[in-house]
Amino acid sequence: MDVKTVRRWLANATYKVRDDNAHRAAEVLGCTPHDLWPNQFQPSTARALATNPGGPFTATLYASRTQLPITAWQQHFADAATGIDILVLAATFLFDTLDGFLDTLLAAAARGVQVRFLIGDPDTAATILRGEEEGIGEAVIARCRTSVELLAPHAGTPGLHIRTHDTTLYTSTFRVDDTMIVNFHIYGSPGRNNPVLVLSRHHEPRLWATLEQAFAHIWDSANPLIRKG
């Protein structure tokens, strides 16, 4: 959260404020997010999050990934201030549906954001198995290969770190600063049809830590992508 972000809030009363930024601002000012943005936050939810961080929490859940608006994905990545961590198998939708997705990552890296991108290795047993489980055969392999080929020319770009992994993914995660989009994977169902949770670090620190630890374990065992082009 920086001065530019606060200015956007002041200039546009209907600006969609990210959960983590709203709670951070409320903590600094000694109030609740509802006090600052009554149209975006319910009183009970805001107080529950502020006073009971270790108990049940309220987060945004979508029944499928396709229900999360494209604009929400775009703003999620565009707002990055310190770090972006992406853990996926193929995620070709990022390149196909988010206008200028790669440019957004490159711009973030150029301004000092540390970007880490974990993409599935198309030539591994885990990728082949996922295609069999989803009933689409080699389509998953082709998608992984497409994403790798799109990323490869940018491997080695300062601030943009890309690695390939061979793990079985139970969740795909898209962390930007203190907000994470979590795409669960249900057996036999493609990612686009599976639930998505939008989670703030402040919602449930233990769950956040578990997801971060999973990313770290996969990152440590992954292989750096070799630059092409």
Language model regions located:
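PLD-like (HKD) phosphodiesterase/transphosphatidyltransferase domain
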Residues: 47-126, 214-217, 224
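HKD-type phospholipase D/PLD-like phosphodiesterase module
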Residues: 121, 126-171
